[in-house]
């Protein structure tokens, strides 16, 4: 007789926006403001077109609902103290119009939490894949990287180096910004447009909780030097 204890998991939150169809229609009403068409920008608009979708006032209800999910993730799931305000610092589009429109491994180094809100996901849409940051259960170097022979009988949550989610429209996925991730095609027959709003979040200490050393202070206390 024995037991196994899984310690120190990486927690990803998957939710669904209740007012998705309303938010989707509102977004398409203003889509032309963010509709980049240059082929080199087809995968993401970050740093090339517009990274501040959250500042569009007509989308306030969308981002307010996103923030409700972020607070559930922080306070209900991860069980942090309610001493933080949520600040969205950047938001941009992720688009795939063909199977090869994939995003390479990366993380978001300037934020605490990142989110993906899926506006549209046609059949065979790209998945989002996450990389195991530690993989202590990999008993041999390169155990999860071989594409020819593997010593693992069945891949599961204990021995895998990657994990993927096939999101549906209306889903919101939240994860630590430091977690490496990518998008990956699931079929060469993908057609249509997979469209998601991606965003970065920092946690800012509330005015009555500035005595904590963890967390940013409100940007009103910052001073810009140039």
For the regions a language model picked out, list residue spans one by one:
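Catalytic core of non-heme Fe(II) oxygenases with the double-stranded beta-helix
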Residues: 95-172, 193, 207-215
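Non-heme Fe(II)/2-oxoglutarate
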Residues: 1-83, 92, 102, 193-226
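Short beta-strand segments enriched in hydrophobic/aromatic residues
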Residues: 119, 179, 201-203
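Short beta-strand His + acidic residue motifs that chelate non-heme Fe in jelly-roll/DSBH
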Residues: 103-106, 181-189
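A short glycine-rich, His/Asp/Glu-containing loop-to-beta-strand
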Residues: 87-95
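Short, proline-centered helix/strand-breaking motifs
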Residues: 174-178
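Residue-level recognition of well-ordered beta-strand positions that form the cores
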Residues: 16, 94, 116-118, 198-200
């Amino acid at each position: 007789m024995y037991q196994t204890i899984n310690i120190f998991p990486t927690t990803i939150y998957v939710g669904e926006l209740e007012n998705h169809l309303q938010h989707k229609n509102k977004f398409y009403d203003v889509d032309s403001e963010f509709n980049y068409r240059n082929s080199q920008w087809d995968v993401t608009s970050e740093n090339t077109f517009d990274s501040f979708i959250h500042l569009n006032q007509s989308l306030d209800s969308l981002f307010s609902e996103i923030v409700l999910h972020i607070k559930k993730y922080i306070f209900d799931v991860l069980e942090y103290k309610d001493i933080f305000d949520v600040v969205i610092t950047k938001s941009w589009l992720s688009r795939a119009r063909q199977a090869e429109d994939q995003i390479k491994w990366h993380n978001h180094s300037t934020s605490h939490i990142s989110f993906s809100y899926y506006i549209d996901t046609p059949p065979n849409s790209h998945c989002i894949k996450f990389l195991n940051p530690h993989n202590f259960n990999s008993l041999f170097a390169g155990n999860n990287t071989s594409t020819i022979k593997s010593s693992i009988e069945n891949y599961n949550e204990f021995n895998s180096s990657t994990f993927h989610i096939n999101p549906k429209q209306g889903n919101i996925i939240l994860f630590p910004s430091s977690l490496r991730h990518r998008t990956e095609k699931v079929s060469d027959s993908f057609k249509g447009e997979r469209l998601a709003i991606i965003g970065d979040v920092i946690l800012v200490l509330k005015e009555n909780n500035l005595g904590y050393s963890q967390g940013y202070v409100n940007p009103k206390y910052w001073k810009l030097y140039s």
